[in-house]
Amino acid sequence: AREALLAAQCPGRRRIAGEARQRFGAVHVLDPFEVSGHPSACYNPLDRLTPDSLDLGEDAASLTEALVMDPPGQVTEAHWNEEAKAILGGLIMFCVCHEDRDRRSLATVREYLTLPPEKLRALLELMQDSDAAGGLIARSANRFLGKADREAASVLSNAQRHTHFLDSPRIARCLARSDFAFADLRHRITSVFLVLPPNRMDAYSRWLRLLVSQALQDIARDAERPQSASEGRSERLKTPALFLLDEFAALGRLEAVERAMGLMAGYGLQLWPILQDMSQLKDLYGERAGTFIANAGVQQVFGVNDFETAKWLSQMMGQETAGFQTDSFKPGDGPSFSN
């Protein structure tokens, strides 16, 4: 219990765990639909992006990876998704570099994407004149405006589809400011709960993806940050932060999670993904599903009810010869034994 925690859980279990975790440190409940009975905390992913950072392009790209879900096996969507990421990244960087601080949010980026055609074109032409972010903003606008009208319309439609969840006033409010930093999970016993009711999971799973991805990015970057002479080793927790991903399948395929399974142990992070069966993992990660199994320190299995998972579990356990003895008795005869 004395470790930092990030949990994507259903409301009932969160309420029980959250009350217990308050004994150890700060508890932040991000609950846009207010099903936990407590006011929701907020986290704005754009708050950690700074206009003069050399990593601004990379940071914007990590956000677009979380926003744009690549369905497993749908190769035909790859081009449109990559182009959607490109224009989204440019709009995110423009927002960070040219908007007032109180306007720097994904809700503003969504506003850009849904502008009337003539106003959107004016915005893109303004981006072409920007020299911020090392010219990346201008390149993004040039890339989009250089497309034929039909292709550009398809790319824009795809970007709008992947950001549709940002139209929710509840989600926009929850992403408007930051009440904490995910890097806190490495420095003090902090608990973060991401709460979505089951009936909202399909529509708003990208919100979960976004926050889990940003948490992993922030922790990795904090771990790589050199400590100053005044900052002793005691400033960082000795026990790893636990990511309890109860709704793992709802996240979709997320490269940040895949990387974390192999690398995050060195960053003071422990992932605990929870799945209904092995098919969910294979559907999401294909041949890379083995990465999760190979890097797992412990595997827990309960109530196996499907053949594929039972077969996998049997193969993992291997074979062993078991010896046993049976006793039998018949009236009028002595006992008999067999091995």
Predicted regions, residues:
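P-loop NTPase motor domains
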Residues: 1-269, 284, 288, 336
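H-loop/switch region of ABC-family ATPase nucleotide-binding domains
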Residues: 275
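P-loop NTPase motor core of the ASCE superfamily
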Residues: 67, 79-85, 183, 258-262, ...
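Residue-level detector of flexible, active-site-proximal loop/helix-junction positions
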Residues: 34-36, 278, 306
